[in-house]
């Protein structure tokens, strides 16, 4: 049987009570958001005739999601992270701000406190038996298009199993493996030696993948490398590059791939190049320049503050 009660005064009054709108104390913004979200959910229960069994399955699911620390993983999977980027892009467009280097999502696996060095860093500890050497470098440009010395380039990525240090279920990786902060040199350049990452897959038995299965979706990301770039007078840029040619490049479960962020990994086998790059054998090279945008009225109007792991 289907009943309609959502629009009754009783239910509407109840939503205000449950959201604390009839209380003096508390936080008005939280009340406003909770009132709206509760209202939308109550309405969905009515419109879709969501059963008690379905509702309680949802409650159990949220508990599982938290117990597995996967809320930050389901979030990009459901497109929230990309949607927030779309909104920031639209705000920038409205302000006439051009992002020569597109932003894309941070993801849930950044860790603050990586080792810092000037100009160059070796990122991998050499322990990945399948690691193929990657030389990744480029120039950071300021908002006027000039090379920018002393910019901070934070880079993090996965190993050849798609696992990140600090989040590796095998426990194989040392702290901060494949996580570095490089300060650009006097020419605005950064350079790292690391290994080509593999794509990421959601934990196959976890609650995120469980829901994706119900949606008929996979939980894979293409091979990618994360960046934060920050510098005086500029907005912090959050982005990623994809290694070109990955089968998931244009089928990312987290919707982070964007035009301008797909970069070829060029294979070098000639002895000259191997010697010039001070590596032991054949290696891949990726070149990626990033251009920052200036502060808006002296502030970073889009910097994202979120709980992050700091070690
Ligand atoms: C990742 O490495 C990632 O970048 C995102 C967005 C989600 C899961 C794993
Ligand atoms: Fe990632």
From Swiss-Prot:
Q: In which pathway does it act?
A: Aromatic compound metabolism; beta-ketoadipate pathway; 5-oxo-4,5-dihydro-2-furylacetate from catechol: step 1/3
Q: Which organism is it from?
A: Acinetobacter baylyi (strain ATCC 33305 / BD413 / ADP1)
The protein's superkingdom reads: Bacteria
Task: List keywords of the entry alphabetically.
Answer: Aromatic hydrocarbons catabolism, Dioxygenase, Iron, Metal-binding, Oxidoreductase
Reactions catalysed: catechol + O2 = cis,cis-muconate + 2 H(+)
Q: Any idea which positions bind catechol?
A: 164, 224-226
Q: In the record, what terms sit under GO molecular function?
A: catechol 1,2-dioxygenase activity; ferric iron binding
Q: Under what name is this protein listed?
A: Catechol 1,2-dioxygenase
Family membership, please give it.
Answer: Belongs to the intradiol ring-cleavage dioxygenase family.
Question: Recorded E.C. number(s)?
Answer: 1.13.11.1
The cofactor binding remark recorded in the entry reads:
Binds 1 Fe(3+) ion per subunit.
Complex formation: Homodimer.
Detail which positions bind Fe cation.
164, 200, 224, 226
Q: Kindly give the Gene3D superfamilies that the UniProt entry links to this protein.
A: Aromatic compound dioxygenase
What does UniProt say about this protein's domains?
A: Contains a helical zipper domain, consisting of five N-terminal helices from each subunit, which forms the molecular dimer axis.
Q: Which cofactor does it need?
A: Fe(3+)
Q: Name one GO biological process term.
A: catechol-containing compound catabolic process
């Amino acid at each position: 049987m289907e009943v309609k009660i959502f629009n009754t005064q009783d239910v509407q009054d109840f939503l205000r009570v449950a959201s604390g709108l009839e209380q003096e104390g508390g936080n008005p913004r939280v009340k406003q958001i909770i009132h709206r979200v509760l209202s939308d959910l109550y309405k969905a229960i009515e419109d879709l005739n969501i059963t008690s069994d379905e509702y309680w399955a949802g409650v159990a699911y949220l508990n599982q999601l938290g117990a597995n620390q996967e809320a930050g993983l389901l979030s990009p999977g459901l497109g929230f992270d990309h949607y927030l980027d779309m909104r920031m892009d639209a705000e920038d467009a409205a302000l006439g701000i051009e992002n020569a280097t597109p932003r894309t999502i941070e993801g849930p696996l950044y860790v603050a406190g990586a080792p810092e060095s000037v100009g160059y860093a070796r990122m991998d500890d050499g322990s990945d038996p399948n690691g193929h050497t990657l030389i990744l470098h480029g120039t950071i440009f300021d908002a006027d298009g000039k090379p920018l010395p002393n910019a901070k380039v934070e880079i993090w990525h996965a190993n050849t199993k798609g696992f990140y240090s600090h989040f590796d279920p095998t426990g194989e990786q040392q702290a901060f493996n494949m996580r570095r902060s490089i300060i650009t040199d006097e020419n605005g350049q950064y350079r790292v030696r690391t290994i080509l990452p593999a794509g990421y897959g959601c934990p196959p038995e976890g609650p995120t993948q469980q829901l994706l299965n119900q949606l008929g979706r996979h939980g894979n990301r293409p091979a990618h490398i994360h960046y934060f770039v920050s510098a005086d007078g500029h907005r912090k840029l959050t982005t990623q590059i994809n290694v070109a040619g990955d089968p998931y490049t244009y089928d990312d479960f987290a919707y982070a791939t964007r035009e301008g962020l797909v970069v070829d990994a060029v294979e070098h086998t000639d002895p000259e190049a191997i010697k010039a790059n001070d590596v032991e054998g054949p290696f891949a090279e990726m070149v990626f320049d990033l251009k920052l945008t200036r502060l808006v009225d002296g502030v970073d109007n889009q910097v994202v503050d979120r709980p992050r792991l700091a070690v």
